[in-house]
C-alpha cells in the first residue's frame, strides 16, 4: 500500500500470458497519497476499465471472458481478496459483483492483519482506529468465490497462520471452496518471484495456478487465449 509499481511485475503478466491467460497488471494509488479504502476503489475501476477495453473489436479474436479471476501478492492479495469477497467496490464501479468475479488467487496475502504492528502500514488503515469490516476475513461468508491461497514455506513479514490459513479456514467454514498450497523453498518475496524465469529453480507457483484456472475454466466456461508455443 505504500510502495511498488506495475512495471516491477511485468514478468507476472508475461508468465500468465504464456500459460494462455489474458492478463492485466494494474496500478493503484499508494499511501501517503491515499488511505483505505481508496486503493480498493482504484482496483474496482481498473476492472471496469478492463471490461470496457476487452469489448473493443481488436480483442474479439481472443474471446475474452466476462468473468475475472483476481490475483495479487502481499498487499495486492489483500486488494484482490477484498474485491473478490466484498461486493461494495465492484458494485460502486458499475459492475455486477455476482457475475464479474469467478475466482481469487492470493500469494502471501494480508487477509487478517489487525492489530497492525508494522509502523509503515499503520497509517494506511488509520491505526489504532481501524475502519470496521475492512479485512478480507470479514467477508469469508459473503459469497462463494473459489479461492487458491498460496503461501511461502516461511514468511517473516505476513503471518501465514493469521492470514492465509485463517482465511482458508473461514472460507471453508462458510461452505466456500478454498485450497491452500505451501510453495517449498520460498519466502514472502521469492514466492511471487517464482513466476520469473530467474527463479524457476524455486518451488513452482505456476502449476497450482494453472490447475486452479483450468478447473475454473471447466466449471464456469472461462475463456483463455491459446498458450504460446515453445
Residue positions per predicted region:
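Conserved alpha/beta-hydrolase "acid-adjacent" motif
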Residues: 156-165
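Short amphipathic alpha-helix adjacent to the substrate-entry channel of hydrolases
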Residues: 5-25
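Primarily recognizes the serine-hydrolase "nucleophile elbow" in alpha/beta-hydrolase
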Residues: 45-119
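Short beta-to-alpha linker loops that shape the active-site pocket of alpha/beta-hydrolase fold enzymes
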Residues: 22, 27-31, 110, 186
Amino acid at each position: 500500500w505504500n510502495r511498488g509499481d506495475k512495471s516491477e511485475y511485468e514478468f507476472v503478466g508475461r508468465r500468465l500470458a504464456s500459460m494462455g491467460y489474458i492478463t492485466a497488471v494494474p496500478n493503484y494509488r499508494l499511501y501517503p497519497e491515499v488511505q483505505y479504502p481508496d486503493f480498493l476503489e482504484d482496483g474496482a475501476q481498473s476492472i471496469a476499465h478492463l471490461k470496457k477495453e476487452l469489448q473493443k473489436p481488436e480483442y474479439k479474436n481472443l474471446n475474452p471472458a466476462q468473468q475475472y479471476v483476481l490475483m495479487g501478492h502481499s498487499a495486492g492479495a489483500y486488494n484482490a481478496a477484498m474485491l473478490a469477497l466484498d461486493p461494495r467496490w465492484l458494485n460502486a464501479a458499475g459492475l455486477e459483483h455476482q457475475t464479474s468475479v469467478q475466482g481469487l488467487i492470493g500469494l502471501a496475502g494480508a487477509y487478517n492483519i489487525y492489530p497492525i504492528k508494522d509502523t509503515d502500514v499503520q497509517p494506511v488503515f488509520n491505526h489504532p482506529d481501524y475502519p470496521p469490516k475492512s479485512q478480507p476475513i470479514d467477508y469469508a461468508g459473503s459469497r462463494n468465490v473459489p479461492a487458491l491461497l498460496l503461501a511461502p514455506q516461511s514468511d517473516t513479514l505476513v503471518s501465514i497462520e493469521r492470514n492465509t490459513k485463517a482465511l482458508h479456514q473461514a472460507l471453508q467454514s462458510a461452505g466456500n471452496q478454498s485450497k491452500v498450497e505451501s510453495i517449498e523453498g520460498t519466502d514472502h518475496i521469492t514466492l511471487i518471484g517464482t513466476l520469473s524465469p530467474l527463479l524457476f529453480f524455486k518451488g513452482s507457483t505456476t502449476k497450482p495456478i494453472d490447475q486452479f484456472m483450468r478447473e475454473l475454466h471447466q466449471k464456469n466456461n472461462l475463456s483463455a487465449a491459446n498458450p504460446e508455443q515453445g
